[in-house]
């Protein structure tokens, strides 16, 4: 290995150690605790070394932001793969979005500004467009040909995102209250039977009377910490969105 190659490899290793240390700090202490000085102390390098790899803390946050969106996009694509209709794709993506949020809280908080301000550059990353495209493609396929009045797919994407983010935020930021409500409600399933999960979605967007439990619903139960009511609301939100387009 030549000198140039060795320097490149060493630079990549230092950059990776900076990100690894930053992520460990976020996991143990939260995003507000992250600082260039603390990262430098953790990896035993000087502050100028950190700045030689990242212009500022926002540059580090941007790196995590992009990675988070790549993870989310892959989850959404996996969820919609092999589905028989756009209704099923949207339903599956809604559950995948929820699951991602609670299994990757730190990423989600950063990506969507939950408890931490997002930098302006994060709003212009190409991964945002990929996220938009993954959902909008299914929305376009869902819109009946010649529907009057015309449906704007981008507007519907914004509506879907707003509904999903709002539901996640309520449950993530007010977990204790949500748990109390769920307990008081007796943890009802979709059909009023405890433990019943998400079912398949017919053309009219309504939840069928005899739902079956799916991997998505099981993941949601374990990730959120309060099932039943949260699942009922999640399914209602997604199905109402679908019905609003197809009817």
Task: Name each region found by the language model.
Residues 5-13, 55, 59, 63, ...:
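Residues at secondary-structure transition points
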Residues 102-120, 169-180:
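Amphipathic alpha-helical segments used for helix-helix packing
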Residues 66-90, 109-112, 126-147:
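Amphipathic alpha-helical linker/stalk segments
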